Amino acid sequence: RERVFIGSSSEGIPVAEAIHKELDAHSELVVEPWYKKSKFKLSRSYLDSLMGILDDHDLGVFVLSPDDSKTMRHKRMRTPRDNVVFELGLFMGRHGCGRAFMVTQKGVPDSWIPSDLKGIHAVSYDPKPQHRAQAVSQVCETILEQLAGERSYTWLTEWRSRSGVYHEQLILSKRAVAN
């Protein structure tokens, strides 16, 4: 079973909880949001704890809710928390972009994310509570589709690798019988 880490700001917890509930319904996943049990250990730095989280999880889902505002080039912009963007970057670096999912809020004028992330496809949700369940369900469906496609590719690669080994064993056994 694959272990999924969900990262968000405190303000993003309602969306993270909805994602947790949706993904947790799939038996092939073990879903662990940052706020459920302490992922950050006593007497350790946050960075040390994050490195442990990277080791313990196969993929991450990060809610980049626009909780902060910053002035960028004389314009006020709404931004996700720096720590959530940092954690996303750590997961991308360790597990690859295909296993670190960005979840963004739809319809935020003047929103900003680091330019290096703008070319990476994110899934979006409707922030209104009355639409959240359906929106998050669609977000999770997109993530699960990507994982299913990745698994079938992994299965094919493993099958090809095994079939090559079986083929070699067959040739060697035929040679042994012939001698």
Residue ranges and their predicted role:
Residues 1-60, 94, 175-179:
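Conserved N-terminal substructure of TIR/SEFIR domains
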Residues 8-9, 65, 103-107:
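Cofactor-binding loop segments of dinucleotide-utilizing enzymes, especially the Rossmann-like FAD-
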Residues 44-47, 51-54, 81-88, 133-140:
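Amphipathic alpha-helical transducer elements in NTP-driven molecular machines
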Residues 96-112:
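Nucleic-acid nuclease catalytic cores
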